């Protein structure tokens, strides 16, 4: 009879098989009411799951991440139930949990309207209030196909037909609605109390544009109302900070149909870019990197030898000239190996660090493009370190220090570190992967940091350390990477002369602190809501006159500040000063300098700092304030 070990180490013995719910009830009535699912020997299961052996069990409630996952998945089914109640002719397809919520795809004769969405959400609330039991049962594959065909659910039947013969499938029934699902689900609809439908979008069946267009209803679900309110507030703030809107409002960049996934940078936007790039260039120079430049296009044969053609071809732009195939580079690494290979290298040259603000192009699907965050043409702050195995840990430590200093400079103080391990599609021997992954773990230990491991998410040629920064809205963005690669030096025949005069392969470390500069600038725009710190702002201040009488004095002030190295705009338009102040406030400039007759007579400037009136200052005092505000180089 089963002995059940709980997370605190205590063991409960039962004289017959017992469900997860019954174990929870034996601990306390409160826990039984709160139980949403269980984790039996690491596997997430329903509360109705019968345990007939000795096992480890954790009861899952809405306080656990697993609990929230179960709530969201179950709410997707509640959505489908409500749609079938209101629109019986609609056919259901798939409805998974996603980040912060869920979606469900439906086939219906007409698009769902905002009024439909409100009615569906109301029906979901009614069904939840009824606290209808959610029951799991199993059917053989062929019976499941016959069942779904009998109720007119052709899409579900098609899904099951792709499952091998002889499989037994799990179905979930709540009231009049039954769905195919692995589960687990909440024990009853009454556990689903906090949800909201967000929007409807189109989605092709099975993600194939040749198939029919379905309607995807997105929703969000939470354990507590205050969590939902906080999420909706975050979305509202995110909309205000949307880099696509601010990019136009602040005259930084624009996008247009003639160049999908490519960015047109305006003067202010390009100044912002240069502020970031020049800071990174100085940082890399200080760290001993040698800046290089590699061709935009190289013979397809090189990409075949590197492994990119076999593992990345669908993302590459291919062209032809004089009967030779060329690929526009999606990455900089093979080019850096060519520079390494251009001369005889000695162990005394290592570590050799190359850096490139390399322009890359990737053939991203048009549906995946998003402002400047997801583009087809982008620049990476790329770098490659050629070193010996003995040098890996020190190089990793040095890069870790560098990347943390960079994030601190840009105002990101919350950084999570993750280790992405071998993907399903990869090159190289398993023993090489074992060595590379353990090498990355050793490097992280040497840095003295904690990390999370992500199985299956490494690059096709090696594992990678990922740096995830958290922005002002609490959103996480993966930016920096450090990848350990034994494969590419082998495939492209890179070697150096060792201290015993033998030829050896270098280890290659791929590294980037920011990743795509376009994406990082998008993150910066949204993080600061366009109100950049002084050092980063494309225009740091504007000098405005009140009347024509102060125009010459205003121009002198602007010229003197420019001479001291500041980025200054001069606004001498014949407009009311209130109008000029409001207009420049929308541009989110760090400082506005106003000069009238009094300032001109006294040799002063009136200063506003993003709405805060700093009063009248001498130009020397104001310049000293500016210099004190600028970070050290």
UniProtKB/Swiss-Prot annotation:
Any GO MF annotation of the entry: metal ion binding
Keyword Cytoplasm: yes
GO cellular component: cytosol
InterPro entries per record: aa-tRNA-synt_IIb (IPR002314), aa-tRNA-synth_II (IPR006195), aa-tRNA-synth_II/BPL/LPL (IPR045864), Anticodon-bd (IPR004154), Anticodon-bd_dom_sf (IPR036621), Beta-grasp_dom_sf (IPR012675), TGS (IPR004095), TGS-like (IPR012676)
Swiss-Prot/TrEMBL keywords: Aminoacyl-tRNA synthetase, ATP-binding, Cytoplasm, Ligase, Metal-binding, Nucleotide-binding, Protein biosynthesis, RNA-binding, tRNA-binding, Zinc
Reaction(s) the record says it catalyses: tRNA(Thr) + L-threonine + ATP = L-threonyl-tRNA(Thr) + AMP + diphosphate + H(+)
Protein's cellular compartments: Cytoplasm
Gene3D superfamilies according to UniProt: 3.10.20.30, 3.30.54.20, Anticodon-binding domain (3.40.50.800), Bira Bifunctional Protein, Domain 2 (3.30.930.10), Threonyl-trna Synthetase, Chain A, domain 2 (3.30.980.10)
Region (Catalytic): 242-533
A Gene Ontology BP annotation from the UniProt entry: threonyl-tRNA aminoacylation
Co-factor binding comment: Binds 1 zinc ion per subunit.
Pfam (any one): tRNA-synt_2b
Enzyme class, first EC level, given as a word: ligase
Domain TGS positions: 1-61
Binding site for Zn(2+): 333, 384, 510
Names of required cofactors: Zn(2+)
EC number: 6.1.1.3
Stated family: Belongs to the class-II aminoacyl-tRNA synthetase family.
Function: Catalyzes the attachment of threonine to tRNA(Thr) in a two-step reaction: L-threonine is first activated by ATP to form Thr-AMP and then transferred to the acceptor end of tRNA(Thr). Also edits incorrectly charged L-seryl-tRNA(Thr).
Subunit-level organization: Homodimer.
The name this protein goes by in its record: Threonine--tRNA ligase
Taxonomic classification: Bacteria, Pseudomonadati, Pseudomonadota, Betaproteobacteria, Neisseriales
Underlying gene: thrS
């Amino acid at each position: 009879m089963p002995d059940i070990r709980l997370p605190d180490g205590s063991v409960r013995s039962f004289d017959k098989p017992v469900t997860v719910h019954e174990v929870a009830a034996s601990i306390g009535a409160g826990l039984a009411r709160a139980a949403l699912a269980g984790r039996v020997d690491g596997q997430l299961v329903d509360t109705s799951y019968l345990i007939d052996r000795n096992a480890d069990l954790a009861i899952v409630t809405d306080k656990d991440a697993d609990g929230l996952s179960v709530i969201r998945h179950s709410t997707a089914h509640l959505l489908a139930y409500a749609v079938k109640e209101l629109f019986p002719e609609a056919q259901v397809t798939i409805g998974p949990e996603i980040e912060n919520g869920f979606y469900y795809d439906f086939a219906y004769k007409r698009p769902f309207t905002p009024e439909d969405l409100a009615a569906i959400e109301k029906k979901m609330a009614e069904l939840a209030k009824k606290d209808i039991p959610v029951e799991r049962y199993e059917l053989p594959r062929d019976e499941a196909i016959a069942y779904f065909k009998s109720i007119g659910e052709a899409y579900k039947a098609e899904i099951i037909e792709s499952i091998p013969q002889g499989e037994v499938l799990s179905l979930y029934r709540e009231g009049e609605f039954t769905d195919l699902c692995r589960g687990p689900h909440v024990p009853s609809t009454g556990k689903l109390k906090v949800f909201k439908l967000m929007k409807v979008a189109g989605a092709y069946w099975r993600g194939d544009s040749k198939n029919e267009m379905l309607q995807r209803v997105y929703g969000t679900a939470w354990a507590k109302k205050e969590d939902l309110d906080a999420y909706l507030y975050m979305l509202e703030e995110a909309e205000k900070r949307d880099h696509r809107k601010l990019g136009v409002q602040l005259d930084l960049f624009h996008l247009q149909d003639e160049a999908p996934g490519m960015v047109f940078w305006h003067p202010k936007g390009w100044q912002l870019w240069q502020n970031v790039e020049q800071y990174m260039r100085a940082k890399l120079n200080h760290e001993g990197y040698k800046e290089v430049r590699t061709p935009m296009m190289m013979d397809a044969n090189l990409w075949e030898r590197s492994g990119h053609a076999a593992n990345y071809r669908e993302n590459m732009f291919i062209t032809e000239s004089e009967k030779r195939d060329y690929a526009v580079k999606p990455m900089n690494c093979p080019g850096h190996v060519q520079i390494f290979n251009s001369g005889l290298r000695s162990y005394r040259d290592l570590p050799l660090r190359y850096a490139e603000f390399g322009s890359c192009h990737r053939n991203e699907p048009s549906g995946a493009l998003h402002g400047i965050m997801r583009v087809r043409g982008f620049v990476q702050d790329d770098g490659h370190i050629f070193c010996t195995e003995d040098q890996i840990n020190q190089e990793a430590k040095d890069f870790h220090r560098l990347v943390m200093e960079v994030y601190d400079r840009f105002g990101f103080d919350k950084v999570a570190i993750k280790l992405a391990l071998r993907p399903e599609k990869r090159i190289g021997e398993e023993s090489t992967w074992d060595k590379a992954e353990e090498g990355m773990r050793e490097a992280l230990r040497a840095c003295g940091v904690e990390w999370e491991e992500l199985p299956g998410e490494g690059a096709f040629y090696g594992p990678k350390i990922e740096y995830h920064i958290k922005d002002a809205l609490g959103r996480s963005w993966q930016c920096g990477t450090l990848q350990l690669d034994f494969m590419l030096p082998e495939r492209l025949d890179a070697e150096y002369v060792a201290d015993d005069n033998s030829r050896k392969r270098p280890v290659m470390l791929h590294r980037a602190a920011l990743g795509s500069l376009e994406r990082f600038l998008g993150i910066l725009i949204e993080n600061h809501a366009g109100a950049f710190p002084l050092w980063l702002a494309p225009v740091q201040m504007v000098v405005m006159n009140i009347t024509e009488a102060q125009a010459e004095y205003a121009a002198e002030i602007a010229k003197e500040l420019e001479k001291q190295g500041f980025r200054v705009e001069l606004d001498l338009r014949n407009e009311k000063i209130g109008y000029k102040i409001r207009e420049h406030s929308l541009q989110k400039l760090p400082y506005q300098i106003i000069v009238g007759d009094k300032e001109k007579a006294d040799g002063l400037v009136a200063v506003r700092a993003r709405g805060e009136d700093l009063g009248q200052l001498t130009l020397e005092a104001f310049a000293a304030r500016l210099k004190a505000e600028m970070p050290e180089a």
